[in-house]
Design a protein with these regions (language model features):
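A structured beta-alpha segment of the ubiquitous adenosine-cofactor-binding alpha/beta core
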Residues: 48-77, 87, 107
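Rossmann-like NAD(P)(H) cofactor-binding subdomain of soluble oxidoreductases
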Residues: 87-151
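Internal alpha-helical scaffold of NAD(P)-dependent oxidoreductase catalytic cores
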Residues: 130-146, 157-181
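NAD(P)+-binding Rossmann beta1-loop-alpha1 motif at the extreme N-terminus of oxidoreductases
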Residues: 1-42
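Glycine-rich, N-terminal phosphate-binding loop of Rossmann-like dinucleotide-binding domains
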Residues: 81-83, 120, 171-172
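Conserved beta-strand segments of alpha/beta enzyme cores
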Residues: 23, 62-64, 144
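Alpha-helix C-terminal capping/helix-to-coil transition sites in glycosyltransferase folds
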Residues: 74-75, 112, 164
Length: 181
């Protein structure tokens, strides 16, 4: 699995998938953040996160960190987009430029089938735009895009991920639905 973005959603997602036994590569462009994470330090407080990171970075080696997705898509089946979507001050709407940038990078680097999952907090219709950005550069047979919004609460995010009270998956076909299950 590849997780793009190591903020709150991305890091919780990556650490919890590692806890389930998946090999996870977390990607972020912030070199200082990557160095902190590689040393096993979490950049925010979440109960249990330091222990999960230590376990899966240093012991099981299921979590690794990279600064680009370029070299990671050959060995991944699912890419989670978990980048920030800050609110624009004047328009009171989400700034999706980081999501679009990741979609472009994915399109430039996919060589085999991948499921692209938007997990960031995004408005309705974002997944369709991500699909269009990627399909403008590569054959639609090489990917599907799914929406899988997060419902994590600060202070209980690990438990919320491992034992969710609901899971939402937005997809247009059985193949991607089955992968997500």
């Amino acid at each position: 699995l590849t997780i793009v973005g190591t903020g709150y959603v991305g890091l919780v997602t990556g650490a919890c998938f590692a806890e389930f036994g998946y090999s996870v590569t977390c990607v972020d462009k912030d070199d200082k953040r990557l160095e902190m994470l590689k040393s096993g330090k979490c950049p925010f407080f979440e109960p249990g996160m330091d222990e999960l990171l230590d376990k899966h970075i240093n012991k099981t080696k299921l979590i690794t960190f990279e600064s680009t997705i370029k070299n990671n898509l050959d060995n991944t089946d699912i890419i989670f987009i978990t980048v920030g979507t800050p609110t624009r001050r004047l328009e009171d709407e989400a700034d999706l430029s980081f999501v679009w940038q990741v979609a472009e990078e994915i399109a430039e680097n996919i060589k085999k089938y991948c499921l692209v999952v938007t997990k960031s907090t995004v408005p309705v219709g974002t997944t369709r735009v991500v699909q269009k950005i990627i399909s403008n550069k590569i054959d639609q047979k090489l990917f599907d895009v799914v929406s899988n919004p997060e419902f994590l609460r600060e202070g209980s995010a690990i438990n919320d991920f491992i034992r969710p009270d609901r899971v939402v998956i937005g997809t247009e076909n059985k193949k991607s639905e089955n992968i997500m299950k």
